[in-house]
């Protein structure tokens, strides 16, 4: 038996635009996405000689084929015609669930990377990302990591320059958001403001953190805020403490802000933790 270890890194959406619904039921998106240092830890036992098994240290996480990490292992082994003679996947969760931070997708991507490394890396990172699209829309980006423009339903990736040095503070309120319901609301409403992805890309190319902050925007944010005024309260706290930018990530419900240094982030984190238990400090990676 062999044990594999891999980190599963969360993501944030610096921008997120919904361009329209496709014939296959998915939506075309355009988003600048960023990997951050908040991570789950994945351990995989290969060759257990037993039925497949998944364990997680957090309650409420499915521990069967519904879990994207399990699905990723199945997709990889089927595609590469590998018989591992039993797999046990163990997930130590730190990425909050139902936050818009890609926790399940990050776990799936980590499984794909670990299995590919175990079998001698027969697939390039690009090919592995393509395989990840069979598992979930955010999985291709979570395979590649870094900073990227993500399009289509998540399968089209273009690497961008690294995020300028900064610190993220992320706050996850208690409520969660139904992603299917959110897309339904987006389909039924007229999107007013949209992110300027070209401006965001130019800011990254210039390494200009101030302009990056000026162009952070997520079309889902006002839709979710209309139903959950608590998001405005969190953002008012961030504004009060002078955060350079603040925005919901993905389909929510986590809100992040961008600051220039760890000391500033620690002050904001301490303030938020007076009301919210799930607050994280992270770096772009």
Predicted regions and their residues:
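Contiguous, small/hydrophobic- and glycine-enriched helical/loop subdomains that border
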Residues: 108, 112-149
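ATP-binding N-lobe of GHMP and related small-molecule kinases
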Residues: 1-99, 117, 121-126, 163, ...
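Short, conserved aromatic-histidine micro-motifs
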Residues: 59, 126-142, 268-284
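Conserved, helical-rich catalytic subdomain that frames metal- and/or nucleotide-binding sites
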Residues: 144, 149-245, 260-270, 277, ...
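Short, basic/glycine-rich phosphate-binding loops at helix/coil junctions
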Residues: 49-62, 111, 206-217
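Residue-level signal for inorganic ion chemistry
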Residues: 14, 42-44, 69, 104, ...
